Design a protein with these regions (language model features):
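Nucleotide-activated sugar donor-binding and catalytic core shared by glycosyltransferases
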Residues: 1-246
């Protein structure tokens, strides 16, 4: 099996890798036609952010309030988020479940003291008032919704592993997620830089959120770190295209 893959690698004129570690690994196998280009996902999320669209339902739900967006959540994430929602009545929340499980959606709606709505049930005549939670029970718009947010939470960290942190970070959002994140380099980097926090329980989530809620200077500093990180790592696509067509 290993020999088969090595033979396949020998057919390439140039191999593009994301980091120096990968280049060094290939060097130990005798390959010197390796170029560190970076991660094209940074270019992709930047493109998505530039193409983010206005969404009438989100505009009307958010109003003049600050918004917390939790994307791709699983049930253990939602257990923490319900407590955070109820402890912060002056903040609006959007929760986008990873799977549209009706029992979980019903629980979110029932346990949110400030009132909840489902995105798919909103119409031009919907009155949002003080409703605190909007459940994003649809697909294809989460990346644009991050553009409305002040803070973010990425689900999956209590289960198979966290989902895409870059979609939130590219908007300059502080990010929190569960403990299963170590295999994702960008998540490790964001934690090291202070733009993200891994939490294992509600108290850790609350401790992360409150300073970002109450200290505008700290919030802006953290946001800049997240945004600068994603900006700094853009450009891989251009390197690859330029090399191929040189």
């Amino acid at each position: 099996y290993g020999g088969m893959w090595r033979q396949a690698l020998e057919s390439f004129d140039v191999m593009f890798v994301q980091n120096e570690e990968s280049k060094k690994l290939l060097a130990t196998l005798g390959f010197d036609n390796v170029l560190v280009a970076g991660d094209t996902r940074f270019d992709r999320v930047a493109e998505i952010a530039r193409a983010a669209r206005r969404i009438d339902v989100i505009d009307r739900f958010k109003g003049d309030n600050r918004l917390f967006v939790a994307g791709s959540t699983w049930e253990p994430d939602e257990e923490l988020l319900i407590r955070l929602i109820n402890d912060n009545p002056d903040v609006k929340f959007v929760v986008a479940p990873h799977e549209m499980d009706e029992s979980r959606i019903a629980r979110l709606m029932a346990e949110t003291k400030g009132g909840a709505l489902r995105y798919t049930q909103c119409t031009p005549r919907t009155t949002y008032g003080s409703r605190q939670l909007l459940i994003l029970d649809t697909v294809g718009i989460l990346a644009s919704v991050y553009g409305y947010a002040t803070w973010s939470y990425i689900g999956g960290g209590f289960c198979v592993g966290i989902h895409n942190t870059l979609e939130a970070a590219t908007f300059g959002l502080p990010v929190a997620f569960g403990p299963n994140y170590e295999k994702f380099k960008e998540a490790r980097d964001l934690v090291t830089l202070g733009a993200a926090r891994s939490v294992t329980d509600y108290e850790q989530l609350r401790t992360w959120f409150v300073p970002l809620r109450d200290n505008e200077e700290f919030l802006q500093k953290t946001s800049r770190i997240a945004k600068d990180y994603t900006t700094r790592h853009q450009g891989a696509t251009g390197i690859i295209v330029k090399t191929i067509f040189h």
